[in-house]
Amino acid sequence: LLLHYEVSNALRTTLELEQILYIILTAVTSHEGLGFNRAMLFLVNDKDKMLEGKMGIGPHNIEEATHIWKGIEENKMALEDLINAYDNFKRDPNSRLHNLVKSIRIHLNESQGVIALTALEGMPFEVITEEARLSSEDKYLQMMGTKYFVTAPLKAKDKVVGVVLADNIFTQKPITKADVGM
């Protein structure tokens, strides 16, 4: 409930789409939130019938992950502090994960993989076993280096407007049914 309260309060402070998306992804990755290592957001472009990479939050490699998480721990940063770091995120043109995600365009077609399927079906997918991973291989997942992950549609008035993908690529912490249900 505290997570919901903090995110709701943060969302009430802005009308800027980029900042709203940042708040959502920060809640997905924060140790006080859902605690995933990375979160990526793809928005639906109805005109071109595509998903377009919009934002990526999280480290690009294990060294960066260690550095970031150590800084969060040393500075005792809470979810609110991480949300308030939006201006730093906005000014960092060197975020490799963010730039990688922004370079991705996925046709809204079943053959394009699980990210496209999430948007088309309007339901979450969990790739948390080896069997599921082998059946969901696609070039976009390979680009991001992700093996086990969850996806969830982002909806507005029952219409899918985007897809969030989250993984634990660095900690290799198993993604459980409880994580997916949060």
Language-model region placement:
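Regulatory sensory and allosteric helical modules in signal-transduction proteins
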Residues: 61-136
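Regulatory loop-to-helix N-cap segments in sensory/regulatory domains
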Residues: 135-139, 143, 147, 168-182
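Signal-transmission linkers at sensory-effector interfaces
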Residues: 1-19
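Helix-loop-beta substructure at the N-terminus of cytosolic sensory domains
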Residues: 13-65
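Flexible loop/coil segments at beta-strand boundaries within sensory signal-transduction domains
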Residues: 133, 155-160, 169
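A short, aliphatic-rich beta-strand micro-motif
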Residues: 147-156
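Short glycine-/small-residue motifs
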Residues: 140, 162-163
